[in-house]
Amino acid sequence: MIMRILTVSDIHGSHKALERLEKSAKKADLIIVTGDFTILSNHIEPIMKRFNALKKKVMIITGNHENSNKVKLLCNQLTNLYFMNNKIFQINNLLIYGYNTNGFSFKDERFERDSLKLVSAIKKLKKRGAPLKTILISHAPPFGTKADKIMDEHCGSKSVRDFCIKHDINYCFCGHIHEGAHTVDKLKKTIVVNPGPYGMMFEI
């Protein structure tokens, strides 16, 4: 079953971006928010209520601007929102793993340790012979793609890059680097997407 997935990043409370999201969401089956939807958690509750009002499943990870505990609490209160920090969610043949990766370092040892749970889940599902596509939701983009480039320098996560390559992740939806927004790139077998605040839609 093909799903229309709308992914968006780094909204930072922009009313224009939220209005665009509300229009685009009408055509989506699932919405994925890859962090930094606020500025330092300002107006976090009304923004998340707008996400909830989309009446679609909305998967959210935090970026460096959100308070994770507050986001988790609101996700628990709002019926359409799913808190995805270090969480796995399966929909049909899609295995989705969310992680609020550190956007300010090349190496993220916490991610390298915790992401092994996704590797275990992939192995179990493959043993059953089920067709499977994997999506990593990461605030930090993988190192060495259009998604993490500022001028001529790459500043993404080498931990995310290595994980995607080693485990043949199908899609990596990311954000954080505003200069890399609205880009799609390929990292070996992984399609890397930094959708920016106006979002991008994919049929998967």
Which role fits each region the language model picked out?
Residues I2, A17, I88-N93, E109-D114, ...:
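Binuclear metal-dependent phosphoesterase catalytic core
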Residues V8-I91, P195-Y198:
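Core catalytic region of metal-dependent phosphoesterases/phosphodiesterases
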Residues D10, I31, D36, G63, ...:
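Divalent metal-coordination and catalytic microenvironments
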Residues H12-A17, T38-H43, N64-K72, F104-K107, ...:
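Active-site environment of divalent metal-dependent phosphoester hydrolases
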Residues G13, E66-G156:
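Conserved catalytic scaffold of divalent metal-dependent phosphoesterases
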Residues T38, F51, K55, H139-I177:
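Cap/insert and terminal regions of metallo-dependent hydrolase folds
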Residues K57-M59, Y82, K133-I135, N170-Y171, ...:
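Proline-centered loop/turn at the N-terminus of a beta-strand
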